[in-house]
């Protein structure tokens, strides 16, 4: 059956700021306390979406979350009106205010893990929400992510959206950022590669930075998504690269159809994995970048592998990269050599995503890949699909509500909270989502 990959990109939230909340993510730590520009951030993301849609790629949007997230502060013992809580937490525990104001839901590669219908035992598209257990600010996301996905993938005859795994370290799950699918045509059965950083009985794990994904979680997600057991491979990421800032597998590898583009040091038992894939995937091709051409540290600094690898109509592939790759002489030299060689990657396209990149999120972080047949695509909420009208509407919406300068101190401004809620109220109507946010369900928008 014919199917296509649809990229669902996350819209950057109104409270996008640099707080250094993500230990193990070196860009996040390095840019802590810098002044951010939320309006520029959301527009950089929109420009990427629109450019790819104009080039013929199927593109959709996933909205941001409600931030600052007052219910989490109430759980932490802060009391009073919303405004009083903001004032208290800003004075008593500003770190918590930054955490509940994080715009991290924009990195929807961590929203869920997706199984196309061709790989599922029941013939449905499955999406299992990630619990993002390793970081407090990200562990807040799962309930609203689930509500948003249910509002987008509404048809229960076509889609099954599963709640996140229990919030315990043993089942730490980071979603599609640690998942790749390889195969031939999108509509044919593929091989799903689940990548983990640790497992309970295995002492091989990083020493400096946390391994966020557990094998136990990956196995549970594969079961929930009803992935055919004959089509699954579980592989451990190289703990040494995690300790160099590769906090998700999509910082060191990306796949599309029969191609795996990765660093030579990406996986713990890389030769074994490559041989498995060669046996299981017809026409499999591994493009392994040697350290002598691109070091792991340069890959992390430029996000070479946090790229999008997209199939074009002629069978060739386009590699979508952040501008940091072009700015790095060695990486750019390698890329120009790559597209001149005999492999499916025949073109590269560069985007300026500096606002997201400074928090450690490149092109791949910003998108969730969902393979859909024509019938399944018709069942998706049509209001989220990118086109000229939606691009114009979202830019006007961003101009109206987003600030062009934000610091950590601004997060305590009650006006920012009100601006955000009003913006999301408008957005849910624009995208036909219904009342997906807690403030809409409690009437807090009136208060």
Curated annotation (Swiss-Prot):
The keyword Cell cycle does not apply. GO terms for biological process: arginine catabolic process to glutamate; arginine catabolic process to succinate. The active site is at residues 174, 248, 365. Pathway: Amino-acid degradation; L-arginine degradation via AST pathway; L-glutamate and succinate from L-arginine: step 2/5. Substrate binds at residues 19-28, 110, 137-138, 212, 250, 359. The keyword Lipid metabolism does not apply. Homodimer. Catalyzes the hydrolysis of N(2)-succinylarginine into N(2)-succinylornithine, ammonia and CO(2). This is N-succinylarginine dihydrolase. It comes from Salmonella enteritidis PT4 (strain P125109). The gene is astB.
């Amino acid at each position: 059956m014919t199917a296509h990959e649809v990229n669902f990109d996350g819209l950057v939230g109104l409270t996008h700021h640099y707080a250094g909340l993500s230990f193990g993510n070196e860009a996040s730590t390095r840019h802590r306390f810098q002044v951010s520009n939320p309006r520029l951030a959301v527009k950089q993301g929109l420009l990427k979406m629109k450019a790819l849609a104009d080039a013929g790629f199927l593109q959709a949007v996933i909205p941001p979350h409600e931030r600052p997230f007052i219910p989490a502060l109430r759980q932490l013992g802060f009391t009073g009106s919303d405004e009083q809580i903001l004032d208290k937490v800003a004075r008593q525990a500003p770190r918590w205010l930054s955490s509940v104001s994080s715009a991290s839901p924009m990195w929807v590669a961590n929203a869920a893990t997706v199984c196309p219908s061709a790989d599922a035992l029941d013939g449905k598209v499955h999406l299992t929400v990630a619990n993002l257990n390793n970081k407090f600010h990200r562990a807040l996301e799962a309930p609203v992510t689930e509500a948003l996905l249910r509002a987008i993938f509404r048809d229960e005859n076509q889609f099954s959206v599963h709640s996140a795994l229990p919030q315990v370290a043993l089942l730490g799950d980071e979603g599609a950022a640690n998942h790749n699918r390889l195969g031939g045509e999108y509509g044919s059965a593929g091989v799903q590669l689940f990548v983990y950083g640790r497992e309970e009985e295995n002492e091989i794990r990083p020493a400096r930075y946390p391994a966020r994904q557990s094998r136990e979680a990956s196995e549970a997600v594969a079961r929930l998504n009803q992935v055919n057991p004959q089509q699954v491979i579980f592989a451990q990421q190289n703990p040494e690269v995690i300790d160099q800032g590769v906090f998700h597998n999509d910082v060191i590898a990306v796949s599309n159809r029969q191609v795996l583009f990765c660093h030579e040091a990406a996986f713990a038992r890389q030769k074994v994995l490559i041989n498995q894939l060669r046996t299981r995937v017809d026409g499999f091709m591994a493009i392994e970048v040697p350290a002598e051409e691109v070091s792991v540290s340069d890959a992390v600094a430029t996000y070479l592998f946090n790229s999008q690898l997209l199939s074009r109509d002629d069978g060739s592939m386009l590699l979508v990269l952040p501008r940091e790759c072009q700015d790095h002489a060695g990486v750019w030299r390698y890329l120009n050599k790559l597209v001149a060689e005999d492999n499916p990657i025949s073109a590269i396209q560069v985007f300026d995503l500096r606002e997201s990149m400074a928090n450690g999120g490149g092109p791949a972080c910003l998108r969730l890949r969902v393979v859909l047949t024509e019938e399944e695509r018709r069942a998706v909420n049509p209001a989220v699909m990118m086109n000229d009208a939606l691009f114009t509407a979202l830019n006007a919406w961003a101009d109206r509500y987003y600030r062009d300068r934000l610091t950590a101190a601004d997060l305590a401004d009650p006006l920012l909270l009100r601006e955000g809620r009003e913006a999301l109220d408008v957005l849910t109507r624009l995208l036909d989502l219904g009342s997906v946010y807690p403030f809409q369900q409690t009437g807090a928008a009136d208060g």
